[in-house]
Amino acid sequence: MVDKYLFLDFDGVLNTGFYRDLLISKGEPWRDEHGPIFDPQAVEQLKRIIDATHADIVIVSSWKYLGLEAMQDMWATRHLPGRVIDITPSVVSASWSLDENGIDARQSKGIEIDFWLFENAVQDARYVIIDDEYVILDSQLPHFILTNPFDGITDLLANRAIALLNG
């Protein structure tokens, strides 16, 4: 059986501008103890991806700095679909000079994903990266799904993720 991984960002993917604006316009809370509340429509699309592919989730969002346990606690508290197995490492340090290291800051997530795959994935693993920013390595482009931060994961994007993960 082929291992499948979903590298998942939150802001602009599950936490959408549309849903935040909707909650604010209704005078309802748009945050809980974990942060911004995720858009139920985006969560439903995530559920479709997980149900169809059985992919494990690796968090690439800046929320990862809260730690893996905090991410897993939030997943359980919010009854989110799938299983968060890890967070990507932080390979870009604030003390680094990106220019001196030949690293483009816009590719930092891509470097972290590449490092995670090297350290953890078995050969021939399938993966997708879902993010609202182009923050990947060129070699990861075939695995990349770019969301509109206002809409997050849509039906069309979920279908693409399913096709990529299921081959």
Can you describe what each PLM-predicted range is?
Residues 1-3, 123-124:
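Alpha-helical hydrophobic/aromatic positions enriched in membrane-embedded helices and signal peptides
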Residues 1, 64, 149-153:
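Short, exposed beta-strand "edge-strand" segments with a Pro/Gly-rich flavor and a Y/T-containing core
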Residues 71-167:
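C-terminal cap/substrate-recognition subdomain and adjoining C-terminal extension
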Residues 3-96:
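Alpha-helical substrate-recognition element adjacent to the catalytic core
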